[in-house]
Amino acid sequence: MGIQILPPQLANQIAAGEVVERPASVVKELVENSLDAGATRIDIEIDKGGSKLIKIRDNGSGIPKDELALALSRHATSKLHSLDDLEAILSFGFRGEALASISSVSRLTLTSRTAEQTEAWQAYAEGADMAVKVMPAAHPVGSTIEVVDLFFNTPARRRFLKSDKTEFTHIDEWLKRIALVRGDIHFTLTHNGKIVRNCRPAMNEPQYLQRLTQVAGRQFADEALRVECQHDDLRLSGYLQSPWSTVLTDTHYFYVNGRLVRDRLVNHAVRQAFAQKAEVEQPGYVLMLDIDPHQVDVNVHPAKHEVRFHQSRYVHDYILQALQSALEEAGELGFERPFEPSSPQIRDEASLSETGAQTQTEHHAFELQSPESKTHSTWNEASRVDTSRAETSRESRIDSPLGERTRDIASARPYAGVQSNAYGSMAVPRESRSGSAGESRARAELPSKVAIASYGELLQTPSYSVQDKPYQPVLAMPAILNGQYWVLAQGQNLSLLPIQSVALATRSHEVETKLATGLIGQPLLMPVSIAADTDWPALLEEHETLIRQLGLELTIRYQQLIIKKVPPYLRDSQLAKVIPEWLQSLRFEAPAPNALAVWLAEQSLTGFTSAADIWAAYCQLTEEKRQQIADKAVSLPWQSWLEEQASE
């Protein structure tokens, strides 16, 4: 048999094997045509899972009479006219294959009318003969396409269809995905005469959140983090699953210029952004990327499920930085805003924590010692006892699932995960389901009368100086107030020491010590690329020693700054933002070592840090350094407050 050109009918049926996989594929192609026509309302009617009837009705621009027959021909389209158009595709369809392929395996009727026409026209095609009949019809401006008896002339394909319920589930799932990215469109979906889905236009964010709730579920919509980031021609928007949520979800939707695609690059960026921040392996997301159409190729997959970015690494790094920024901002908001429990259960726990803090203030067992004021050695014995108790409590909290959950929820606000009761032991668990249970737990954790009396005697013990005894740091961590301050006692004086300032001071000291010998750079899994300024090559050459000392590996190639290695203190920072800002500062003068240490410390403290770890680092500092930090404590005039209360 010699080589010959296939008949159009056979070629269309072969193409239908790629385009028309199942009824959901037909719905996808026809709805996308309606969207390309500028429709604002699309009604979808399905009968028997789509095997009997698929009917799409829209109010788009319509098709002129003389183009109806041509619309059902293969490789006929109004969306492309030149090779340049193929390199910058913004429409859903562009190959001109869908209608011809669908009509070759079904009985297709296309009715349409444009605004310029006074009457509508209808085109009918059936099966392999592909003969198109055009006749007058009644129809408003827009189009209606009916696909009847799908695969009627290909019995083998029809036998591979699943049950009506399964096929309709695929249709509904695809509609949910397109409804998320096209919130301005009114979609209705009917199955066997019953309205299954009615997505009204979402013209503002509250309305869009309602649509998001319909598609992704209420829990995802209520806990999702908003993403909004723009840089040059790239814009990323959408929603991320909360990193503190442990609920598994199948909401993994990514859109490029409004087109739903599957991309491993995006999945990798999401997993990397959520690394060590989420309980689930694959967090849910609804992300929409707007990019210059010249920078992406959508003509790489028969069903258009995949795309290829011209600068895939740049896009990956951009998405990664945008997601990391959203997660960091969520943590910062949690730190700046006092914790306000939303449920009665958590409110009860918060009140119990406050009660414990008040008890600490009145009968505090810990004291920050200074060279000027030393307490009796009995004090150190009490501290050691409480230290073992606190350590045992922390171990039990970490080992138990309950403790992990409490810590993760509090991680939205740094240091809140280590809130303690009157003696620095475990925070009140979230599983306190009733007021009586909470009260019994509070009574169990409050100090006994004997302990109160003992601590009262200690507070009354006069202080004295021990000049020949070396300074010993307190081993037990002080009580925490509101998740942000340590409550320190010096004699009968109380003061508040900001935990954040201690964290910054201890981390700065650590970094400055290591800077003397140079930081060790850690290679990035995916190097970060940034558009380079013209003077950056000179800056990199001038400050080469300093850059190497910081553990950075920066190169410039094709006018792009490539970040290959960073010190561990910059590992979780927004490199695409932090490094350019630092290079900008080098244009004026090289920073001093202490300024560099503070900068690196600030970048490394953007996430959750345990107050216990901060206190342990504080105790390792020298006496002089500890005293400098302690001087930042704010005194509490609790005695004058008691006098005012007594006078009233």
UniProtKB/Swiss-Prot annotation:
The residue range of the signal peptide is none
Residues covered by region (Disordered): 336-443
User: Quick check: keyword DNA damage in the entry?
Assistant: yes
Q: Which Pfam families match?
A: DNA_mis_repair (PF01119), HATPase_c_3 (PF13589), MutL_C (PF08676)
The UniProt entry's GO CC annotations, sorted and at most eight, read: mismatch repair complex
User: Which biological process annotations from GO are given for this protein?
Assistant: mismatch repair
Keywords, in A-Z order: DNA damage, DNA repair
Source taxon at top rank? Bacteria
Q: Where is the composition biased (Polar residues)?
A: 370-381
Q: Which GO terms describe its molecular function?
A: ATP binding; ATP hydrolysis activity; ATP-dependent DNA damage sensor activity; mismatched DNA binding
Basic and acidic residues bias spans: 383-410
DNA repair is among the record's keywords: yes
Recorded hits in NCBIfam families, A to Z, give: mutl, PRK00095.1-1
- Give the protein's function: This protein is involved in the repair of mismatches in DNA. It is required for dam-dependent methyl-directed DNA mismatch repair. May act as a 'molecular matchmaker', a protein that promotes the formation of a stable complex between two or more DNA-binding proteins in an ATP-dependent manner without itself being part of a final effector complex.
Please state which protein family the record places this protein in: Belongs to the DNA mismatch repair MutL/HexB family.
What HAMAP family does UniProt report for this protein, alphabetically?
Answer: DNA_mis_repair
Protein name listed in UniProt: DNA mismatch repair protein MutL
Record organism? Shewanella sp. (strain ANA-3)
Q: Which gene encodes it?
A: mutL
